[in-house]
Amino acid sequence: MIIRSPEPEVKILVDRDPIKTSFEEWAKPGHFSRTIAKGPDTTTWIWNLHADAHDFDSHTNDLEEISRKVFSAHFGQLSIIFLWLSGMYFHGARFSNYEAWLSDPTHIRPSAQVVWPIVGQEILNGDVGGGFRGIQITSGFFQIWRASGITNELQLYCTAIGALVFAALMLFAGWFHYHKAAPKLAWFQDVESMLNHHLTGLLGLGSLSWAGHQIHVSLPINQFLNAAVDPKEIPLPHEFILNRDLLAQLYPSFAEGATPFFTLNWSKYGEFLTFRGGLDPVTGGLWLTDIIHHHLAIAILFLIAGHMYRTNWGIGHSIKDILEAHKGPFTGQGHKGLYEILTTSWHAQLSINLAMLGSLTIVVAHHMYSMPPYPYLATDYGTQLSLFTHHMWIGGFLIVGAAAHAAIFMVRDYDPTIRYNDLLDRVLRHRDAIISHLNWVCIFLGFHSFGLYIHNDTMSALGRPQDMFSDTAIQLQPIFAQWIQNTHALAPGTTAPGAATSTSLTWGGENLVAVGGKVALLPIPLGTADFLVHHIHAFTIHVTVLILLKGVLFARSSRLIPDKANLGFRFPCDGPGRGGTCQVSAWDHVFLGLFWMYNSISVVIFHFSWKMQSDVWGSISDQGIVTHITGGNFAQSSITINGWLRDFLWAQASQVIQSYGSSLSAYGLFFLGAHFVWAFSLMFLFSGRGYWQELIESIVWAHNKLKVAPATQPRALSIVQGRAVGVTHYLLGGIATTWAFFLARIIAVG
């Protein structure tokens, strides 16, 4: 008889068929809430329906059920993303001039949308070159497609169909993992396993497979394209993958296969894994071989990182242990208890992730122009401006979202009775010191940064240019920024001996890369004008942080309202009996923070747009003389408020204002319409609820008189709803106005 040790029990981490699939239930509006499901008595019902549909906390208190809903919703989100991507690729296949652009990217502009002639709007189809008429696009898809080795429209069709299949698969997964096999709470809380799988699978294997694609497909195809080979003559991707000899003709080391890898003779791979720095002079993009090297290195890092956490094998890190060991001399219990917070409050988790992702998105915005990753991206000024602006806005919204969910965590999930002397508790206990100091910093930055401009406007108005802060009078050079630029420019040969050139041309030096007579990138000079506007950036960012952080730290209580936690995340005022307690809820801080986020990002994208047109973008003559779009006027014009209004806003708005009758006229209409949407927001922001309720009751009286009164009783928007509608139109109108202004300008002159 063989005596075996008992088999370890396999944990069952899913529930089978927990919730039945019922179209009848889903067809009933508000089925998730007993109150809303009763149907409308007043028009407030439709607002509550929208406010609570995705607020899973309000449907149930069961953390497992909430987790499953969030998990399922993520698949729905992925499905929409695949659907959107499919649409982009389909447009590229069906309505674009991609193949023409590929053959001549310096003279032909990308277009993937053709307007139908219905009421004469075919005027919007501009001549983008190569005999194609359509709307010029600025999304950067053409550049991405070229970089990844797509050479014809059939490949785009296939990818579009593939994305549709994935969209359907994601929808199925969302249904399956909620209705058929729903994970248990323990599965959502198993952070070590999650880290291992996400780091290894998504980031590690994802980067590795991308590096593989770039080596075997993108690199040879781009090599041929750069040598001006007709795309139709280039072998197809599968030929490079299946036939090693083809690659070996371009890169001889391929003939040796994996031998150099296993014999540690890695320098053999130096042909396609490089460390050049700078830009490829043919395309104005980063060297593809540098990008491949980067992805391979990232893959190795994350494959290692994805094996660091302790799961069934009893080796590796435990997150709880790491957090609890994290104590400093001044931090009391340190991170003790943080593990419990982050595994039971998805708002806390989401808040951190949004803050990180928002910051990362802004980092991406800055790298897209300083290290343009795709071929012919740097000379497509419209796309450069669009990508910067887009990523800045997205980053701003994500960071405000981080504060919103941090505050929701404080109100709904934070339990002060079990938190004592840990890091969060200590921050909350000296929140007055934090907020009052931050307030002082905001006042200091505001008066000094704005004061420098006011000084310049005054001196300029009085005809005393010699007394202004400028590069030609009283200089305020950004010496620290210049030192950083210089350090990076000199890095090759000193701190980075392996690199041929510095990471970005913007750092300085003599280099200039021009493609097809247009500047791709050159060293960006920083002077007094940049010093001034950078302090405006510091000011607006600090005020945004002040508002958002105050909202988080005072979300549960304050001297004014000690029992704020009982009032919830959003409330208009503390009851009718207490005056002066309006706009104190955590939600109101998010509301106010959004306006300052809008201020911050607006100044950043204005700075970028003007600086690049003035000091970087332009044409280069055969003699090597660069002519910038606005002729280098940033340094002298942007040092006064008047200069910003006159030489940036007014001077550069001429293209959008004069666009009627041209292919840019849609931007003129959008410019007008978006101004209207923005102005419409003020109606919601400047008037009180009572005004509208009074008006509505008068209108209802008239309907009753005519016997056409509706069964659902009309109600004015609540105070919070009015603010929500107001801020939405304010931001939407403002962003769309800026979008029309930027694009009409840069498409006309770029």
UniProtKB/Swiss-Prot annotation:
A cellular component term (GO) from this record?
Answer: photosystem I
Known catalytic reactions: reduced [plastocyanin] + hnu + oxidized [2Fe-2S]-[ferredoxin] = oxidized [plastocyanin] + reduced [2Fe-2S]-[ferredoxin]
Just give the chief location class. plastid
UniProt binding sites for phylloquinone:
692
Q: Which GO terms describe its biological process?
A: photosynthesis
The Enzyme Commission number assigned here is: 1.97.1.12
**One Pfam family of this chain:** PsaA_PsaB
Q: Which residues form a coiled coil?
A: none
Q: What does this protein do?
A: PsaA and PsaB bind P700, the primary electron donor of photosystem I (PSI), as well as the electron acceptors A0, A1 and FX. PSI is a plastocyanin-ferredoxin oxidoreductase, converting photonic excitation into a charge separation, which transfers an electron from the donor P700 chlorophyll pair to the spectroscopically characterized acceptors A0, A1, FX, FA and FB in turn. Oxidized P700 is reduced on the lumenal side of the thylakoid membrane by plastocyanin.
Q: Which family does it belong to?
A: Belongs to the PsaA/PsaB family.
Assembly and interaction partners: The PsaA/B heterodimer binds the P700 chlorophyll special pair and subsequent electron acceptors. PSI consists of a core antenna complex that captures photons, and an electron transfer chain that converts photonic excitation into a charge separation. The eukaryotic PSI reaction center is composed of at least 11 subunits.
Q: What is this protein called?
A: Photosystem I P700 chlorophyll a apoprotein A1
Provenance organism:
Phaseolus vulgaris
Query: What is the taxonomic lineage of the source species?
Result: Eukaryota, Viridiplantae, Streptophyta, Embryophyta, Tracheophyta
